[in-house]
Each structure stands twice: as C-alpha cells, then as structure tokens.
Amino acid sequence: MKPLETQNQPGRIGKALAMAVAVAALGWVAWTLWTGNRSWDASPETAEVPDAEPAVAGAIPPDFPRPGMPGYQQPPAGMATVGTPPGARPIPSPATPATARQLDAASLGAEIQRLREALLTAADGRGRQRLIQEFGELVATAIGQLGADAVAEELVRLLGAGFEDIDFRLPFQPGFDGRMETVPNWRSLLLDGLAATASPVAADFVRNHVLDQPRTTADWAMGLKVVWEASGQQRDDPYFSAKLAEMLRNPTWTQQPTGALLESFDFVVAQHNKDLVPDMVRFLEGETDSGTPFAASIVLQRMASADPSVAATVVRETTGVQLDAEVAKSRATIVAKLDPTSEAHLNVIRDYLADPGVSADEADYFLRVFPQVNVIITPNIASTQYPDTRETLARKQQAGLALFEAWAADPAFASQRSAIEESVARLTEVVEAARRAGIL
C-alpha cells in the first residue's frame, strides 16, 4: 500500500485530513480510511524491514529508518535479530495446525517455542507478519480450550524465563481485530498474548514486572494494553490513569517519540481521560516531523466530537496565543468537529471565534471546513470507533447551513464573507442532495 505523503510529514495536518479515499453516496460526507503506514511507524524501536511490499496492512514507508539514517537505533545489546541466513526459508507449520488440535500446557509451550524458532529464521517481513498472526490464532485457540488464566500462566512463565529477546525489525502497529498487526520484538508479542487473555494473572505480572519502571515505550504500551483488557476496559481505573500519565509525561520518551508512544495516545480516547487533554494540546506544538502533533490532533478531534468540554479545553489552553500556522489549522479542525445541532457545542464555537488569538487566516480556515464530518478510521490499540449515521451527518450539515446563513447576515463576519458564502454553497448542495435521497 502506498503511504500517504502526510504520513511522513505529519505536520501537514490540513492536507492529511483532506485526503479521503472513499466518498459516500450523494457526495456529502467523506470518510478517510487510514489502515496503517502511520508516520510514527518509523520508530527508533524498530528497524529495517527487508520487504518493499509487505502482504498485509502496516507497510513500511520508503524513508523508514535504516542503518546509517537519522532515527535508526541498533537493537539493545543482547537482543537477537532476525535475518536471512544463506538458504533460509520460512519454517513450515506442522502437518496438523495447533488451532485444529487439543492443547495442554505442554503442547502450548511447544507451539510457542516453534513459532519463536520460526521467527528467528523467517526469510522476510511477510513471513514474520504471518507468524505473528499465527501466534494470535494460537493464543485465541488456547484460551478457548484451556481457559484464560492457564494461558496467561504459561505466557508469564515464558516472560519470566530469561529468554533472549528477538528484534523483528517491524513497526508497532495495532490491527483492527484488537490484536497487534505487527510488534517490534518477541517480548511485545508475548505481552500481546497476555492482553488477549484479559486475565488477573496477566495484570498482576505486568504491574510487578513491566510497569514497575520505565524500560522501553513498546514495553510500557503493551503493559498498558494488558491492564486495560484485564480491567474490562474500565475507564476510571486510577492505576491505569497514573501509568498512562507517567508514560505521556516521561521527558525522555516524549522528546524522541516512538511508534509505541504515539499509538498509546489512543488510550486517552479509550479512557476519555480529560485530565490528559492539556497534555494533548501541548503535543500539538511538537516537532512536526515526529508525528506528535498529528497524533495529538486525531485524539482531540475524536474526543471533541463527542464532548464539547474537550474542545473548550483546547480553546482555553490556547486563548490569546498566536499559534504556528499548522497548529492553528489543527486547532480549527478540532473546533470544527463540534456539533452545530448542540447549543453547548455552539457556545464553545462562539468563544473560539471571539478569541483575539485566532488569526483571520485561522478563522477563514475554520469557516471553510465547519462542520467537519470527515472521519479518519484507524486501527487502534484500545478504542473503538462508531461513525455517525447518514441521518445524523445530514442533520449536522443542515444545522451548519442555518448557522452560516445567519452569519452571512451578521456584520461581525463581514471580513469572512467569502469563506461564509463558499460554505453556504457547499452545504446547500449537500442538504439538497440529502433531501432528494429522503434522508432529511
């Protein structure tokens, strides 16, 4: 899959949000399907993937850090690395797949060891991705046959056995099925298996041996995933909240963000953690090439569309501040996610437009994109996305049209007349199409 230009230049938020790969019937709502290749896949915790075209989602951008390039980091000392020895080929699966056999603790351990050996000698990135998927299927089968606690106990045994880690040279990439699409190393893969068990055994191990002290962002992210699943995805878990905040406020990690760190922003959405919204606002002003502003913008857009207080926090945290042009566009896009059918949302919009720190260019941009109904659908480490129905989207567009018609007659908006008239024309076309289709 060809990476989007903006995924390697995440500061160009406006362009990224405008790139829709599918447009719904009637041309009145754009849905952006974004299934991988995020800019933050190029993480110091990952390394080169030999394949130019991996077979599954999560392909590596062409400028992915390689030895000698900025951002490349050698695997930690003592970590085995996958390679392509002379004559290497993927190790075949046994004649009877584990998913088709009755497992016990011993055979589960043997199957996991087989996959470990296969991952060490797999000839290419495609092979490693297939083996990672096979591991997930094995864990799911074992949970069904042995029970979650028994599987967790076996994985904990393996994690505590003092094994040599394996650097897979793959990115930290969630999948759409709740499992990881790819992980950077063997330890992360075992932790993903623990997360699938949602077992108290898994959570206890992680609290004492993973989240007890900072090691790597991949370790911490997977530890959070284990605790999140074991708690039943409990939003108000104080331990989880504290550990998430600890990760997002670790200066060593935030100054050199990895894919695992940026994917962990999604926990803020999943938990609807409004205490961390100010942190997300600060991340908007990070180095654009790091992917941090783009990731933070997505988090804030998703939260603001459901809760106007999030957008209000964004406005409050940036009131009176002249922002960089790209950050200003990001702020405008977040506010544009607000619902014009809600008076509470409209109050936030009024405060935003009255802010002296909002430049004429930013206000013009906001007026041209509001109401923002584009949706970026992503594979996420924790949260689930529920896009609006056609009817809900049409009602938002209709309310937006009424608002723009009122603004067109308001002398206070005289300087933005061009943007307002453009939006009136845009929304009139959309609303008329929805009426013809019987949606309104």
Regions found by a protein language model. Name each.
Residues 1-10:
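Juxtamembrane low-complexity tails/linkers enriched in Ser/Thr-Pro and polybasic
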Residues 15-32:
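Hydrophobic membrane-insertion alpha-helices, especially the h-region
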Residues 221-225, 294-297, 329-331:
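Alpha-solenoid helical repeat scaffolds
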Residues 258-261, 291-296:
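Alpha-solenoid helical repeat architecture
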